[in-house]
């Protein structure tokens, strides 16, 4: 039996739709980050990519250039050792987080000693839902009679459930942008970012032959309450706008897991462990309210209360998702998404779970704290939850 620990974690910058990373093939983007996480760990230790036994990656839209087991294709595209196995999983927006649960589980079971959990979504190049085909009605049997709304309607139902107003979500959206701006100004993301070389595209999205080094998240916007108030709701009569919803984005992230004894034998310092993990089903009627349940589950498994948690990274799919969770669990909001979230930074869906774990780890280290909760809503009325502890 093994004892899984995180020894390295990194992510690409997040590019906005048709932005800085959109000229890069999805396999090149993920492969660059897979290689970066091993390189960063191996600089001091002599760890090599060939020491990795398995890679598990999350990807939501497994279609086109994200099909055919992208975790494996990306690994080979990056020139990494062919004997390393790879699997790609779809747990909707929780894919990248569930990949970490699975790799940690393999190590705990003694099946492997070294593994990478990662996530990718190049949403500029592979549109969300493209894998469903032209007739989305085929996804569900004719006998399906469950009220599972689309994500936009779900966000509005959650808002009504908790009495969340337009002003509430606008205030939250503004704060996400403010915190992200502060984080970048203070260099808080510098250690977790692996810069990416990407082709430059012209106005017709054609390569110019030039390349740029992308080292910063692109989605941050100058925002005011007045400006947010002028935005039109996505749904008529709704409260969510483009300023209070997650962005369509491109990005990848990777976390290197090892058995603790093996890590120490390589001269690597274990940085964090999983205290508790969960994947739960939530109420289909509300679809995206699952972080309420997954948080309760991991806190129960860990024997903790929300006040024991130092840092929370909860995905900002929509502002109401976070605000609903907060009204139930009553956290100190100064500990929640302290460096902004998907409203400001972006949400490359298959990547985000690994990105949140990466960000949470680095923020714990920056502030010399111990415990972080990472949670997300996911399509199909699912939610992932993880508590990690610094070692």
Swiss-Prot record:
Positions with a binding annotation for CoA: 151, 221-223, 246
Pathway the protein acts in: Steroid metabolism; cholesterol degradation
The protein's name in its UniProt record: Steroid 3-ketoacyl-CoA thiolase
Function in brief: Involved in the beta-oxidation of the cholesterol side chain. It is important for utilization of cholesterol as a sole carbon source in vitro and for full virulence in the chronic stage of mouse lung infection. Catalyzes the thiolysis of 3,22-dioxochol-4-en-24-oyl-CoA to yield 3-oxo-4-pregnene-20-carboxyl-CoA (3-OPC-CoA) and acetyl-CoA. Also able to use acetoacetyl-CoA (AcAcCoA) as substrate.
Chain positions recorded as substrate binding sites: 379
Entry keyword set: Acyltransferase, Cholesterol metabolism, Lipid degradation, Lipid metabolism, Steroid metabolism, Sterol metabolism, Transferase, Virulence
GO molecular function: acetyl-CoA C-acyltransferase activity; identical protein binding
Biological processes per GO annotation: cholesterol catabolic process; fatty acid beta-oxidation; phenylacetate catabolic process
Induction: Induced by cholesterol and repressed by KstR.
PROSITE patterns: THIOLASE_2
Catalytic residues (UniProt): 93, 347, 377
Catalyzed reaction equations: an acyl-CoA + acetyl-CoA = a 3-oxoacyl-CoA + CoA; 3-oxochol-4-en-22-oyl-CoA + acetyl-CoA = 3,22-dioxochol-4-en-24-oyl-CoA + CoA
Summary of the knockout phenotype: Cells lacking this gene display an attenuated disease phenotype with reduced colony-forming units in comparison to the wild-type. This mutant is unable to metabolize cholesterol to androst-4-ene-3,17-dione (AD) and androsta-1,4-diene-3,17-dione (ADD).
Protein family (similarity comment): Belongs to the thiolase-like superfamily. Thiolase family.
Keyword Acyltransferase (UniProt): yes
Domain of life: Bacteria
Subunit structure: Dimer of dimers.
Enzyme Commission designation: 2.3.1.16
